[in-house]
Every structure is written in C-alpha cells, then in structure tokens.
From Swiss-Prot:
It holds the Pfam family IF-2B. Gene3D superfamilies: translation initiation factor eif-2b, domain 1, Translation initiation factor eif-2b, domain 2. InterPro entries: eIF2B_alpha/beta/delta (IPR051501), IF-2B-related (IPR000649), IF_2B-like_C (IPR042529), M1Pi_N (IPR027363), NagB/RpiA_transferase-like (IPR037171). One of its GO terms (molecular function) is guanyl-nucleotide exchange factor activity. SUPFAM superfamilies: NagB/RpiA/CoA transferase-like. NCBIfam families: PRK08335.1 (NF006210). This is Putative translation initiation factor eIF-2B subunit 2-like. Coiled coil: none annotated. Keywords: Initiation factor, Protein biosynthesis.
Length: 276
C-alpha cells in the first residue's frame, strides 16, 4: 500500500483539469521523492512498482508519465530514487527554458498568434517573446468544458500581452486572422502525430487551409518511443448538460502533414520532406 502523502498526489493528478503533461510529470516525480522518504529499504522496490502502475493508469498514452516511469529505477536505494526524480524535474525545467528561447525566435512584432487550451511551454514562449520587446496579440480559445484557455488568458494579461478570447466553435473563423499558431502537446507518438487537447486537430486543419504556420511546443520527454497514433488511448471524462450525457473525449490526434515543426529543447523538428 502506498503512503497517504503519495496517494494524495495521485488523486491530485487524476482530478487535475487545467494543467497538462508537464505539470503531471513534475507531480509524478514529486510522488517518487515522497515515496523514497516515506518507505524504508525493505518495502521501497514494491512501492516503486505500485507507484509506476498507478501513474501509468492515469493516462496510458501520456508520454511524460511513461518516460518518468521508465526514468525511475526499481531499487531499494532511497537516495538513488530521490536523486533520479530530482534529476527528471531539473531536466524538465531546463528543457522548458530552452523551448521558450527557441520558440520566441519565431515571433515577430505585429504577429497575431492563435493557440488552444493551456500549455506551460506555449506560455513560456509567449512570455519570453514579450520580455524581448516584441509586441503581438494572442487569439485563444476558452477551451471548454474546463475552460483552461481562460487560465492562460489571465497569465498572458499579467504579462501585459494583448489577448482575444474566442469560443472553441470559432477556431476556423479566426484562424485566418492569425500569422502563427503555437500549441502544446501531451504526447508525440512514435510516428510523429501529436496528441493534445481536443480541438487541436481542428485548429491545425484551419491553419493549413489558411496557410498559417502551425507549430507544436513539446519537450523531448513528451515523445513516446513505443506507441503509434493508432495505439493511442483517448481518455474520455463523464460530462452532463441539463440531464443529458455529452461526449467528452479529452484529446485528439493531429497528423504530421498539418504541422510546420515541433519546437523542442534540442531545436525545431521538421516534418519529412514528402509531407511539406
């Protein structure tokens, strides 16, 4: 049985509706740190196996959780577990800073950038561009049904970035007004497809039709080396409106052909030439 403090983190991860894969991975790493502090050497290995299983069950297709689970060794050495989890968090933070710097170079003053949902990587890119003196506007969706787009809007306004909030249904209408699109990612599959908040695929298609460059910001620990786009399990959460059940699949899958590039801490990954 996992310690109560660890179970509390797992419940927080399961119930989170606003923050995405980066936050989930960090909380998961914190759970491993707590586990190393709460269990002794005689029960640590068993605890690690159980915690890995619990984390992977939260979202079986989320690469950040899979890669975190693979990064932590099964050992009875408490210090090793703690150091590995801390190293994961450190690398993740460094990756996001590098992505912010690389992504900000894509933005010019006068740009109109469109995005969907909340991505901490996208926020850092926009914040960095603003702090480099660039003036631009961001069009963003409210991102129903959890409305995490409003969370992003507030964060951008706190950075004195001009925002325009639209309903999700207007993605196609407003995409043509943008000069650049940047979204985050929960997972990049083995075959290069992007799993992200439902609506991302629609935005990508709209940008493709309007010839608006569509970029994805994703740390390399969000790349899944095992699953392909056809093997992704799309999580659905119960949703009811006025007594009626509403389908609420949380994610969709965007093919490579609609993506101009994926911004990573190692640089921008471009699609295969036959997809350009």
């Amino acid at each position: 049985m996992l310690p109560e403090k660890v179970v509390k983190i797992l419940e927080e991860m399961k119930n989170e509706k606003i923050r995405g894969a980066s936050w989930m991975a960090k909380k998961g790493a914190e759970a491993f740190i707590l586990l190393s502090e709460e269990l002794d050497e005689t029960s640590l290995e068993e605890g690690i196996i159980e915690l890995k299983r619990e984390i992977l069950e939260i979202n079986p297709s989320m690469a950040s959780l899979y890669n975190l689970a693979m990064f932590i060794p099964i050992t009875n050495d408490r210090e090793v577990v703690k150091l590995r989890a801390e190293e994961f968090i450190k690398r993740a933070e460094e990756a996001k800073k590098e992505i912010a710097s690389i992504g900000a170079q894509l933005i010019d003053s006068g740009d109109v950038i469109i995005t969907h949902s909340y991505s901490s990587a996208v926020f850092e890119i926009l914040k960095t561009a603003k702090r480099r003196g660039k003036q631009f506007k961001v069009i963003l969706t409210e991102s129903a049904p959890d409305y995490e787009g409003l969370y992003l809007a507030k964060a951008l306004q706190d950075e004195s970035i001009e925002v325009e909030i639209i309903t999700d249904a207007q993605l196609g209408l407003f995409a043509k007004d943008a000069t650049l699109a940047i979204v985050g990612a929960d997972t990049v599959t083995k075959d290069g497809y992007v799993v992200n908040k439902a609506g991302t695929y629609l935005l990508a298609i709209s940008c493709y039709e309007s010839e608006v460059p569509f970029y994805v910001a994703a740390e390399t620990y969000k790349f899944h080396q095992k699953i392909t786009s056809k093997e992704v399990e799309l999580v659905e959460r119960p949703l009811y409106r006025e007594g009626s059940r509403v389908r609420n699949v949380l994610f969709d899958i965007t093919p490579w052909k609609f993506i101009r590039g994926i911004i990573t801490e190692l640089g921008i990954i471009l699609p295969p030439r036959d997809m350009i």
